[in-house]
Amino acid sequence: ADEAHRGQYGFDEKIVIKENEQGEKEAHTVIGNARIIHDALPNATYIGFTGTPISAKDRNTREVFGDYIDIYDMTQAVEDGATRPVYYESRVIKLHLDQNTLALIDATYDALEQQSDAATIEKSKKMLGQMESVLGADSTIQSLCEDIVNHYEKYRANLLTGKAMIVAYSRPIAMKIYRKLLELRPTWNEKIGVVMTGGNNDPEDWKEIIGTKSHKEELARKFKDNDDPMKIAIVVDMWLTGFDMPSLATMYVYKPMHGYNLMQAIARVNRVFKDKEGGLIVDYVGIASALKAAMKEYTKRDQSRYGDMDIAKVAYPKFQEKLQVCKDLLHGFDFSGFIGGSPLM
């Protein structure tokens, strides 16, 4: 099975209540795919290939396929030059979120990890609804977009091809981000695009922006074209898996994610591209703890190397190393005027 997390799991038998066309409730028995396949082929050998193993209730990679035969971890991939390292920068403080909001975000992460029974799922739905209100507040969206614009223009716009992705919490919030960015930068009309699924009940102005399937395909073509003026894609779920774009180097995260979903998302920025030293994850919702937890699903070697996601501790020593190279090149020259002199006219 390729991509071993997709549809291969489930040893349990569950009873699910659904409504028929007449509005009557009916009970249906649902049996997990893993049990069906194992019962049908009891003597078969099961081998799975995945970059994101799962360890959750009724969804456990090793429970279905057995222990690991071989591991090609992120550390090895970076050492081999197959991928680039991913760096992390927290900018949660820029949104001026209060302690109650931060506590709600933490509770949401817990709910995402524990969706196992009806009561927990119902509780998590309530939390997710609260998150929609908090993260979608006009003042928060204003702070978010102002900081993204400032960060992008200062540090990322002129890096490589300037391609970046904004991961929004929901479809309504994605639209708010899109409109606020255009309000702040009216000339960005060709620079940004929204990529998400549409619905029959969407407002007409949404439909014009979301477009048809062919429109999304055109956006993908434009975004992958390094010379195209489209530089920033606003997404919710689409393009977070299976979208390969080597020049993409920046991801702004405004959506709580955890586990394999988080690992797959950040992998969008670790592809190899000319002169690309690494990808950057800019965090606005406090994913650091979730990222560390996700790392526990990987090898001890990766945990020791990537366990501390503080970019200052990881990248600053490299900056000092490069700075020393510059100092060595200028050895014997008096460059004090460059540091303390007036700007060149």
Functional labels for PLM-detected ranges:
Residues K231-V235, W239-M257, N261-Q264, G279-D283:
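A short beta-strand element within the Helicase C-terminal
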Residues Y9-T101:
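Post-DEXD/H (motif II) to motif III coupling segment of the RecA-like Helicase ATP-binding lobe
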Residues D58-T161, Y178, E321:
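Interdomain helical connector at the RecA1-RecA2 junction of SF1/SF2 helicase-like NTPases
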Residues F11-E21, T29-G32, N60-D67, A103-I105, ...:
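Short secondary-structure boundary/capping segments
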Residues F273-M345:
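Long, hydrophobic alpha-helical segments
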Residues E3:
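Walker B catalytic acidic pair
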Residues P186-T187, R268-G278:
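Arginine/glycine-rich "motif VI" loop of SF2 helicases in the C-terminal RecA-like domain
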Residues K125-V235:
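Conserved C-terminal RecA-like helicase domain
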